[in-house]
Every structure is written in structure tokens, then in C-alpha cells.
Amino acid sequence: GVDSSFLRL
């Protein structure tokens, strides 16, 4: 989800 994408940063 969105959280996963943010953690990838």
C-alpha cells in the first residue's frame, strides 16, 4: 500500500 511505497524511500 501507500505506507510500503513510503518506506522504500
Swiss-Prot record:
One CC-aspect GO term: extracellular region
GO terms for biological process, alphabetical: neuropeptide signaling pathway
Leucine amide, modified sites: 9
Subcellular location: Secreted
Major localization listed first in the record, in broad terms: secreted
Superkingdom of this protein's organism: Eukaryota
UniProt KW Secreted keyword: yes
Keywords associated with the record: Amidation, Neuropeptide, Secreted
TM stretches of this protein: none
Function: FMRFamides and FMRFamide-like peptides are neuropeptides.
Family: Belongs to the FARP (FMRF amide related peptide) family.
Name of the protein described by the UniProt record: Extended FMRFamide-4
Organism this protein belongs to: Namaquaphasma ookiepense
